């Protein structure tokens, strides 16, 4: 689904940057355990075609790097990425000033909210941002 959206936005080269937030298999209760994390499968599927940045408030940067992902601060991830993906429900991600962060991101932008942490209506203010997630058309 992500590749399809990016292709429709003409984002198909290795120049396309994806920012993945949440490497632990769950955000709450907080853990640094990445075993069986769906994020790892996602990265495996995307790494060949795109440049991947990542963030997790608990997982050490070294663990993120082991998966061929570049660790980055949240603000920098938003400013530098064509696609932003939230992969777990950590409280850090629930409390972001999402409108400000999206406003600063390159356009067009794909925002994938796998946990539906944010109301889709927030994104109505941004005609060049596509909001999607699991079970969202």
Give the role of each language-model region:
Residues 1-137:
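Structural/interface elements that position substrates and couple domains in central-metabolism enzymes
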């Amino acid at each position: 689904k992500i590749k399809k959206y990016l292709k429709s936005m003409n984002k198909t080269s290795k120049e396309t940057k994806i920012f993945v937030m949440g490497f632990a298999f769950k955000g709450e209760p907080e853990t640094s355990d990445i075993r069986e994390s769906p994020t790892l499968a996602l990265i495996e599927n995307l790494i060949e075609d795109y440049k991947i940045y990542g963030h997790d408030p608990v997982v050490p940067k070294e663990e993120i790097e082991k998966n061929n992902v570049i660790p980055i601060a949240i603000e920098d991830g938003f400013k530098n990425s064509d696609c932003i993906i939230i992969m777990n429900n950590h409280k850090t991600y629930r409390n972001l000033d999402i409108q400000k962060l999206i406003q600063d991101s390159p356009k067009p932008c794909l925002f994938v909210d796998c946990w539906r942490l944010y109301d889709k209506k927030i994104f109505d203010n941004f005609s060049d941002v596509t909001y999607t997630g699991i079970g969202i058309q």
